[in-house]
Amino acid sequence: MAREVKIGYQNYTIKNLDSIVSKCNEINGQFLASDRIIALSSTEDNISHANTLIHEVLHAIIYQWGIDLDDKEEEKICNTIANGLTTVLVDNPWLLPYIQKNLKGEK
């Protein structure tokens, strides 16, 4: 799955999170700022997997733009926004293509 996502001026590699590590630590994703990695569990279903990616990207945005939050506060914000955004995108399948079209400057 080795892909990259550019956030701010940094590129972050998206990698598979080992399923044993994921299960032992009860996590589906991990943002590793110093390694420039977003690690995702390969055991999640599609919607949950997308939600986890959004969640970890939000952690990267908070880090990259230097937003000063304690860990508990940051986790709550990432969970809330990721869950809300995932729900909006699932419930409105036309929305993401519409946004992409407008970002490309297409009519």
Model-derived regions: residue spans:
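Active-site recognition of the HExxH zinc-binding catalytic motif
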Residues: 51-63
